Amino acid sequence: HYIYKLSDIVSKGGVLLLNAAPNELGEIPIGQANLLRRLGQWLKVNGDAIYDADPSPVRNPDLPITHKPGRLFFHVKEQVDRELEVTGMTAAIKRCYLLSDPKKTALNFSQSGDRIILNLPRDAFVGVQGLAVIAADYEGEIQVSDPTLRADKEGLIQLPVSKSTYSNMSISYDQKFGCTHKIAMPWD
């Protein structure tokens, strides 16, 4: 949970602060110490995607993406599907590989317009505590496109759930007082 939280926060330009509070003997409690060790183990393998990384110009609520010059990092939660689709950008991707692979074996991928489809190997999530990081080397500039509100050939516009924010909102008009009431309850 904290590993994903770290990736998500860094992908948005933030910093994760953890309060490790020693007990009355000055010792870090075992639960907190274990959490810090797990974070440290993950960072040994995937730290390049966190340290000195900037948020990506591409926003995707389901896929944290960090960025360094010439390289994007896709932070992928463990999933059954071995195919990962990233949309919303046009970049000349040259090579993709898992940061957890010491050999940096190139992953198969295809690119068409603002869509990149990556094929994940069977062992993509082995030893990465549920969050693999794919490095994607690119050349040139990243062009961001947001297909969220683009009409298809029939003129329909679909808003994907991943790009939506739920809000329990109602609007009513009170004739007695001649005013409109808006009641909103965010789902965060």
Model-derived segments and spans:
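Mature catalytic domains of secreted/periplasmic carbohydrate-active enzymes
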Residues: 1-187
